[in-house]
Design a protein with these regions (language model features):
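C-terminal hydrophobic structural anchor segments
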Residues: 311-349
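ATP-dependent carboxylate/acyl-activation modules
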Residues: 1-196, 201-315, 349-350, 354-361, ...
């Protein structure tokens, strides 16, 4: 689960991490009042679950409360497009109004789960700010990474090594050591998968502050954190993702044109990989799970077809707990209830596969039945070429 910047900063503040003064506004009039309270120049920041807001025009500086009101009026309600939102963008419904700080230097600090090492990894860099992704790609040596063994936990030497890696003087080094320790505490105690401060800034008066913050939490651990569940913002999710969650379907929208319905996360990822290898482009990740009913399969099918970008559908099922005949029944029932115009490629293997194929064949509907995994991907790739 992702949270907004202002929500992440509230968590940081609760752990003693310094942040700029500021408040959230859902109207331009409220933004003006906040600017009057803060005094001096303020920064108006669009609140959406995506990075790159500054380059997209979602972060502006106002010199007066009246200007803050004017800028907030432009930003609130705008469709903000960044490199992380895709071309469709996200609608801005609120802004964070913060004091403008005199920044001397921008740094980077982040904690993620490194699945290859099966450990949390803390990263710091003297080159923070908007270009950190480019630096990570072109000059990875500028980013210091320290893995933390979960069995021994975060130690003082970890914090000191990372703080020195930021090239800070004595007092700032001490502030950084404390901040890194607190961020790791948040990461562990809140079951986070990402805690990022970018930029971490040094101000003119030698303070270290979190100028921007991003956090993501493990959905499967939210039952332990009722305080975090309250931060959930369904408006930031894709409507189809919200719809899928109602039926306990694991659905993530992507930007391709091949709709995928698969049982099992591993098979779903392998399916997306082979579609790409064959020259196609997956439109989603959709795992119906091992025990899906015919009704769930039907709902999954409807969700796939509701995506206007989808031109071809691939249904790839390996029948184990989820029998092939149950899947076939759900597909046929859904296809009969919607005006089916898209080509459907179906690959079934496993439990009751012959019965499943018979149901598809006798349905009277046109399905492209694949003989194996590769054949399914090739069929899909060839069909997309006509669009």
């Amino acid at each position: 689960m992702k949270v907004h910047e202002f929500q992440a900063k509230k968590i940081l503040k609760g752990y003693g991490v310094p942040i700029p003064r500021g408040e959230v506004a859902k109207t331009a009039a409220k933004a003006k009042k906040i600017a009057e309270k803060l005094g001096g120049k303020v920064v108006i920041k669009a609140q959406i679950h995506a990075g790159g807001r500054g380059k997209g025009g979602g972060v502006k500086v106002a010199s007066t409360p009246d200007e803050a009101q004017q800028l907030a009026k432009k930003i609130i309600g705008m469709n903000l497009v960044t490199h992380q939102t895709g071309p469709e963008g996200k609608k801005v419904k609120q802004v964070l109004v913060e004091e403008e700080l005199e920044v001397v230097k921008e740094l980077y600090l982040g904690i993620v789960v490194d699945r290859a090492q099966a450990q949390p990894v803390i990263m710091v860099s003297e080159a923070g700010g908007m270009e950190i992704e480019e630096i990570a790609a072109k000059s990875p040596e500028k980013i210091l990474k320290v893995a933390v063994d979960p069995t021994t936990g975060f130690m003082g030497f970890h914090a000191r090594k990372l703080a020195f890696g930021l090239g800070l003087e004595k007092e700032l080094n001490k502030q950084a050591t404390t901040m890194i320790s607190q961020l790791y505490k948040i990461f562990v105690e809140k079951d986070a998968t990402l805690v990022e401060v970018n930029p971490l800034v040094i101000t003119k008066d030698d303070r270290l502050l979190a100028l921007d913050a991003k956090m993501t939490f493990d959905d499967d651990a939210l039952y332990r954190h009722p305080d975090l569940k309250e931060l959930y913002d369904p408006d930031e999710l894709e409507p189809l993702e919200v719809e899928a969650s109602k039926y306990k379907l694991n659905y993530i929208k992507l930007d391709g044109n091949v709709g995928c319905m698969v049982n099992g996360a591993g098979l779903a990822m392998a399916t997306m990989d082979i579609i790409k290898l064959a020259g196609g482009n997956p439109a989603n990740f959709l795992d119906v799970g091992g025990g899906a009913s015919a009704e769930q399969v039907e709902n999954a099918f409807r969700i796939l077809l509701a995506d206007k970008n989808v031109k071809v559908v691939l249904i790839n099922i390996f029948g184990g707990i989820l029998r092939c005949d149950r899947v076939a029944t759900g597909i046929v029932e859904a296809a009969k209830k919607v005006e089916l115009k898209l080509p459907i490629v179906v690959r079934l293997e496993g439990t009751n596969v012959e019965e499943g194929r018979r149901i598809l064949k006798e349905s009277g509907l046109k399905f492209e039945v694949a003989v194996d995994f590769r054949d399914a991907a090739d069929k899909v790739a060839n069909l997309t070429k006509s669009f």
